[in-house]
Amino acid sequence: MEQRRLASTEWVDIVNEENEVIAQASREQMRAQCLRHRATYIVVHDGMGKILVQRRTETKDFLPGMLDATAGGVVQADEQLLESARREAEEELGIAGVPFAEHGQFYFEDKNCRVWGALFSCVSHGPFALQEDEVSGVCWLTPEEITARCDEFTPDSLKALALWMKRNAKNEAVETETAE
């Protein structure tokens, strides 16, 4: 019985302030002790200004029932960031075979969470196959609609979305300058 429990345990890398791996722990231990770890954040958008928003199930171990402005999740031990992002997008939403853009990393910390986030984005129009034990529903919202309802969203996903929007605005400005 103990061997089966250990085999089903999800292991994650624990990292320091510089995002260097210093240990491994079970996901359960990481949550209980608020250990610093890595996660992926994927902004799924339609390419026309709308963001796919998820409603977290009430059984999630972190911020159940809240809205998420990004897909993604905890990076498993020894897993590459892009590999994790692709795995999470496919598991949560059924998104596979689409290009992912990388937007760098960021740090987020509050009383519930200490995480180094890897930010990605992709364009998808569905249909979406929701992972029933993690995602209870999805809808499309504009960034302005998300901002107006910010108290309903996970704070780490809002930080990821704000960073994506800021980096996207810079890319659009560079493209505009180049075109002139």
Curated annotation (Swiss-Prot):
What InterPro entries does its record include? Answer: NUDIX_hydrolase-like_dom_sf (IPR015797), NUDIX_hydrolase_dom (IPR000086), NUDIX_hydrolase_YfcD_pred (IPR024195)
| Residues annotated for Mg(2+) binding in this entry | E88, E92
- Alphabetically list the UniProt keywords: Hydrolase, Magnesium, Metal-binding
EC number of the protein: 3.6.-.-
Keyword hit for Metal-binding? yes
Q: Where does the source fall among the domains of life?
A: Bacteria
Name any one GO molecular function: metal ion binding
Please report the stretch or stretches of sequence annotated as the Nudix hydrolase domain. 35-163
Matching entries from CDD domains are given as: NUDIX_Hydrolase (cd04697)
Report the Gene3D superfamilies cross-referenced here: Nucleoside Triphosphate Pyrophosphohydrolase
The record places the motif (Nudix box) at 72-94
Q: Which cofactor does it need?
A: Mg(2+)
Family according to the record: Belongs to the Nudix hydrolase family.
Cite the NCBIfam families for this sequence.
Answer: PRK15393.1
- The protein here is known as Uncharacterized Nudix hydrolase YfcD
What organism is listed for this UniProt entry? Shigella flexneri
Q: Which gene encodes it?
A: yfcD
